UniProtKB/Swiss-Prot annotation:
Component of the periplasmic nitrate reductase NapAB complex composed of NapA and NapB. One of its GO terms (molecular function) is molybdenum ion binding. Substrate binds at F794. PANTHER family: PERIPLASMIC NITRATE REDUCTASE, RESPIRATORY NITRATE REDUCTASE. Keywords: 4Fe-4S, Electron transport, Iron, Iron-sulfur, Metal-binding, Molybdenum, Nitrate assimilation, Oxidoreductase, Periplasm, Signal, Transport. It comes from Salmonella typhimurium (strain LT2 / SGSC1412 / ATCC 700720). This is Periplasmic nitrate reductase. Belongs to the prokaryotic molybdopterin-containing oxidoreductase family. NasA/NapA/NarB subfamily. Its cofactor is [4Fe-4S] cluster; Mo-bis(molybdopterin guanine dinucleotide). Gene3D superfamilies: 2.40.40.20, 3.30.200.210, 3.40.50.740, Dimethylsulfoxide Reductase, domain 2. Its EC number is 1.9.6.1. The gene is napA.
């Protein structure tokens, strides 16, 4: 058979990805022509990271049997990474949960009982009793939910609506708190609106790429393949990679920079100083479109108020800032000289200058990419603000080929966690619970009494752990995440809180994860194409998919669980009399009636679904639930810069990037000719701010919450590897991926290993002030730490690396710093 050049390149890309992981390409990925007639194909976004690759899913006899990259998908253009090629296998692990499991002893629930199969009716009976008891005895603040950037858009919307409007509790937060919260607050502080202004099309037009704490080669491999193609096709294109250790992205780097942990703040201020000292400020852009402010400092570390670091902080948690002049800002960054920066960071001067020159050169279009290195940082918001400073000083923003771009790690951290408003402080379309006008907009649109939504910010992820341990949060529903393994400092707060007899923990999951096995009730959940869904990726692209198969056994989607559970509560049981008096017609109605079976949500009939189209939730309820929820939600953003297209448009497209106005998506926000919200003659308008100007912040270096000392003498950084995604609850059930990287290891510099009498392959005990794990020494391989630092991935349930990590957070975003704590090693 003769191959076209395109087919040849695709086939080789697949083989290369597989070879890099030590794998053979699975038969299901080959989509053999002879089988295609027997296989039904439909589109879906990939289940894994926030890149948002499009895939074609092949189903046969009620199972997903094949998967291939969608050649019509603009994100990945027919390619998949190695995880994407094994998507069919994530749903068929041998230990897939198919019925609810409750801890029982002598025929009834018991905290120390054995997991026993029960019906959904029995499961909801116990949940109902626990919710109602806590609501009656302690009120809405005694219940909470921990959700996900892997929820579909309507699942997140339904969860936020149920908790914030139904139960009147803002104690709902997504696991995106652990990965994207600093990016959110950074965007809001600088631009007044969340999410990137650019898109992936920038890659083919950029002259330079700077990676700040992002190993795109392994974590966003499809985007990295596009960057690689751009770099190798033009010798003038440059790539700079900054990290606290060397990794696979360094292989392409023209300037690979390893810096001392936390000192990225110093480098960012040095570059701003370099730009000013070399007269590289875009004065016209700066004068018209930028304000300057000096931020509060010494803001603490998000630890408990009794912690010595919090007591010592002068301005704990302060988001305050004050105006400053350009001369004052110039003097502020002038302290970050080349000599000082080289000394504080450990980076050679010539490398620092080369990096600064990329930003300062007016003829270089620069994209800054970052992921967890910036965000999982006790000054993550500051790091985000400081990188925006570089683009605002030079005017390299909101135009093709240049701009700051925060990459997401989950498939709908943007579309669900951020845009829908599932954070404990947010409402849809960048609105917040503390703003009375925003609450009023939601209450009127949802047709619920004024004052229903609480004005108090709910508990964020780490605060939920602490409240569980303290007995203040007593009923906790965890959906679509594995936070017992993924969250920080397992031993001190989370595990004690989950196993406290005062508390009842529900986990909805397809598999018996560490979280599920630590709970009191496990609810079996439908996965991916076992339900109709929608995700929003890192470039503001909203993508839909249809239900293509049924879930096994009694497994139900998160949406089904939320909506059906809402039937258990009447308004009189959850709302005070003062609210009911405003709308007496709501008396006697259930939360299902008030929130999900309203005229606005239920107006789309089943006739809009094709006769043979699967949609378990809608067919059970008698109306097109997903469409009703989406259209109700989309109303919030239309006309306000968050415009989403009509529901049906997404099923006919490979995703659309908002704002979508008059059927046209937006590639670059805030610039004239690209963004429909920027009028002719305005040039640029950062319309999230009242005056249309973005903000440059003066923010200093401040040290990490914990650093190595004589006893705990090494930095620990945690993260991921190519073959596994997050806690491995899906990828470790794919035999090929598990074989490729079967267990976590400790990546360590050979000299550090030698000094501790350790050799490659030795068992080693890694200890911090909070706990310990036993791992395996690795002195070679893809990750090459400098002396003084070790790196461990967190996918391995047998090596709970978060026994070691500290629950210090960015005080502004409440996002955990998983990249910096102090450990010691001992040979086992």
């Amino acid at each position: 058979m003769k191959l076209s050049r395109r087919s040849f390149m695709k086939a080789n890309a697949v083989a290369a990805a597989a070879a890099a992981a030590g794998l053979s390409v699975p038969g299901v990925a080959r989509a053999v022509v002879g089988q295609q007639e027997a296989i039904k194909w439909d589109k879906a976004p990939c289940r894994f990271c926030g890149t948002g690759c499009g895939v074609l899913v092949g189903t046969q006899q009620g199972r997903v049997v094949a998967c291939q990259g969608d050649p019509d998908a603009p994100v990945n253009r027919g390619l998949n990474c190695i995880k994407g090629y094994f998507l069919p296998k994530i749903m068929y692990g041998k230990d897939r949960l198919t019925q609810p499991m409750l801890r029982m002893k002598d025929g009834s629930y018991h905290k120390d009982g054995e997991f026993t199969p029960v019906s959904w009716e029995q499961a909801f009976d116990v949940m109902e009793e626990k919710f109602k008891t806590s609501l009656k005895e302690k009120g809405p603040e005694a219940i909470g939910m921990f959700g996900s950037g892997q929820w579909t858009i309507w699942e997140g919307y339904a969860a936020a609506k149920l908790f914030k409007a139904g139960f009147r509790s803002n104690n709902i937060d997504p696991n995106a708190r652990h990965c994207m919260a600093s990016a959110v607050v950074g965007f809001m502080r600088t631009f007044g609106m969340d999410e990137p202004m650019g898109c992936y099309d920038d890659i083919e037009q950029a002259d330079a790429f700077v990676l700040w704490g992002s190993n795109m080669a392994e974590m966003h491999p499809i985007l990295w393949s596009r960057i690689t193609n751009r770099r190798l096709s033009d010798p003038n294109v440059k790539v700079a990679v900054l990290s606290t250790f060397q990794h696979r992205s360094f292989e392409l780097a023209d300037n690979g920079i390893v810096f001392t942990p936390q000192s990225d703040l110093v480098i960012l201020n040095y570059i701003a100083n370099y730009i000013i000292q070399n007269n590289a400020v875009n004065q016209d852009f700066f004068t018209k479109h930028v304000n300057l402010r000096k931020g509060a400092t010494d803001i603490g570390y998000g630890l408990r108020p009794t912690h010595p670091l919090e007591k010592a902080a002068k301005n704990p948690g302060s988001d305050a800032s004050e105006p400053m002049s350009f001369d004052e800002y110039k003097a502020f960054v002038a302290e970050y000289t080349l000599d000082k920066t080289a000394e504080m960071t450990g980076v050679p001067k010539d490398q620092l200058e080369q990096l600064a020159q990329l930003y300062a050169d007016p003829n270089k279009r620069v994209i800054s990419y970052w992921t967890m290195g910036f965000n999982q940082h006790t000054r993550g918001v500051w790091a985000n603000n400081l990188v925006y400073n570089l683009h605002l000083l030079t005017g390299k923003i909101s135009q093709p080929g240049c701009g700051p771009f925060s990459l997401t790690g989950q498939p709908s951290a943007c579309g669900t966690a951020r845009e829908v408003g599932t954070f404990s402080h947010r409402l849809p379309a960048d609105m917040v619970v503390t703003n009375e006008k925003h609450r009023d907009i939601c209450e009127k649109h949802w047709q619920i009494p004024a004052g229903t939504i609480p004005a108090k910010v709910g508990l964020h992820a780490v605060a939920q752990d602490r409240a569980l341990k303290d007995g203040k949060l007593n009923v906790y529903w965890v959906m679509c995440n594995n936070n017992m393994q993924a969250g920080p400092n397992i031993n001190e707060d989370r595990m004690p809180g989950w196993r406290d007899p005062r508390n009842f923990i529900i986990v909805s999951d397809p598999y018996p994860t560490v979280s599920a096995l630590s709970a009191d009730l496990i609810l079996p959940t439908a996965m991916w194409v076992e339900k109709e869904g929608a995700y929003g990726n890192a470039e503001r692209r909203t993508q839909f998919w249809r239900q293509q198969i049924k879930a096994p056994g009694e497994a139900k989607s998160d949406l089904w669980q939320l909506v059906q559970f809402s039937r258990r509560f009447k308004t009189e049981e959850v709302w005070p009399e003062a609210l009911l008096a405003q709308k007496p017609e709501l008396r006697g109605k259930t939360l299902y009636d008030v929130l999900f079976a309203t005229p606005a949500v239920s107006k789309f009939p089943l006739s809009e679904l094709k006769e043979d189209q699967l949609n378990d939730e809608s067919r059970e309820l008698g109306f097109y639930l997903q469409k009703g929820l989406f259209e109700e939600y989309a109303w919030f953003g239309r006309g306000h810069g968050h415009d989403l297209a009509p529901f049906d448009d997404y099923h006919n497209a490979r995703g659309l990037r908002w704002p979508v106005v008059e059927g046209k998506e937006t590639q670059w926000r805030y610039s004239e000719g690209n963004d429909p919200y920027v009028k002719a003659g305005e040039g640029y308008k950062f319309y999230g701010k009242p005056d249309g100007k973005a903000v440059i912040f003066a923010l200093p270096f401040e040290p990490a919450a914990e650093s190595p000392d004589n006893e705990y003498d090494l930095w620990l950084s945690t993260g991921r590897v190519l073959e596994h995604w997050h806690t491995g609850s899906m990828t470790r059930r794919v035999p090929e991926l598990h074989r490729a990287f079967p267990e976590a290891v400790v990546f360590i510099h050979p000299l550090d290993a030698k000094a501790r009498d350790l050799r490659r392959g030795d068992k080693v005990k890694v200890s911090s002030r909070r706990g310990e794990v036993i791992s395996i020494v690795e002195t070679r391989g893809r990750n090459r730490p400098p002396q003084g630092l070790v790196y461990m991935p967190f996918f391995d349930a047998a090596q709970l690396v978060n026994n070691l990590t500290l629950d210090a957070t960015d005080p502004l975003s409440k996002e955990t710093d998983f990249k910096k704590c102090a450990v010691k090693l001992a040979k086992v």
